[in-house]
Amino acid sequence: MTMEVVLIAVVVSVACALCGVFLVLRRISLMSDAISHSVILGIVLGYFLSRTLSSFVPFVGAVIAGICSVICAELLQKTGMVKSDAAVGLVFPAMFGLGVILVSLYAGNVHLDTDAVLLGEIGLAPLDRVSFFAWSLPRSLVQMGSVLCGLLLLLALFFKELKISTFDPVLATSLGFSPTLINYGLMLAVSITCVGAFDSVGAVLVIALMITPPAAALLLTDNLLLMLVLASLLASCASISGLFLAVKIDGSIAGAMATMAGVLFALVYLFSPKHGVVRRCLVMRALKLDLDVVTLAVHLATHRYTVERSVECAEVHLTEHVSWSARRAARVVRTALRRGMVERHGALLLLTAQGVSLAQARLDVSV
């Protein structure tokens, strides 16, 4: 049963991550929030029509509700009176709140719990089983497996169109593609994924899996195909590690998965080879050291033939004349010596030919 839970978690994670990459790149990540919270209204309305949650009608209603939330948010944005993030924030609470009211008033005896919709319970997902080609499989695994296969098929067929419309809608239009149609197709795929996943992992975890792994993958690569692969791997790692963490601490599985997704993002944010905080700090430190070496070369070149050379070019006086701390001055001198920019002559620091060239090239100092 644990293996089935792991499989469900991986399938859901990969499906959410694939959709999330395009949401992150299009800067509409919160649209997943709007869709995942709006589905409860569609489920309730679908139940009113079919009088059962086991039919296909609530699923279709949830997908339609997700698309309606996207359309309403875009219509609000096009008025020019509210921005895109505010439009999303206006639409989904209203639809979610209306769904909760309808559940409490007219569907109180229905097995539809708002806590389960938000948080899910993936640990119990294998208990709901269906027969699939003579195999007894968890319904969630079959459902999300079908969604994932559909997403992979759509990516294979329309990868070029999605890529061009995401990065350059004007070029897509000139090539005969419809960015609007592609956008609504993407939103339909996101809606189906959210509806399929919320029953297993809940709306909150769907949001975390759609935003966090793709955002981390974006810090690791600029290649779209590689980004899709990395986002899927990161989402799978977050789900698996979160699942075992929840078992270890006997806590919420959805909460542990979301936490591990955040931990993985934090690690990538800190240690990404290209965009990580540590990398940027090291680059800034190196640039600052390069600038200090140039400053030292200019200072020594300026006073090379002056009567104050014995003072201005003395290493012990750098803290006074260049306003450096003793530690910083020592580090700059070590670097300049290692690079062959200066030489020690007793207590003095004198420029080498390479140091003179550096001063002339960078600041046009006449020496």
Swiss-Prot record:
Keywords (A to Z) from UniProt: Cell membrane, Ion transport, Membrane, Transmembrane, Transmembrane helix, Transport, Zinc, Zinc transport
Q: Which GO terms describe its cellular component?
A: ATP-binding cassette (ABC) transporter complex
The annotated topology with respect to the bilayer is: Multi-pass membrane protein
Location of this chain's protein in the cell: Cell membrane
Bilayer-spanning residue ranges:
5-25, 28-48, 56-76, 87-107, 140-160, 170-190, 201-221, 224-244, 251-271
Biological processes, Gene Ontology terms? response to zinc ion; transmembrane transport; zinc ion transport
Q: Would I find Transport among this entry's keywords?
A: yes
Q: Which InterPro entries match?
A: ABC_BtuC-like (IPR037294), ABC_TroCD (IPR001626)
Instruction: Give the range the annotation lists for the signal sequence.
Output: none
Q: Is Acyltransferase found in the keyword set?
A: no
Function, in words? Part of an ATP-driven transport system TroABCD for zinc.
To which protein family does this belong? Belongs to the ABC-3 integral membrane protein family.
Q: Under which name does UniProt file this protein?
A: Zinc transport system membrane protein TroD
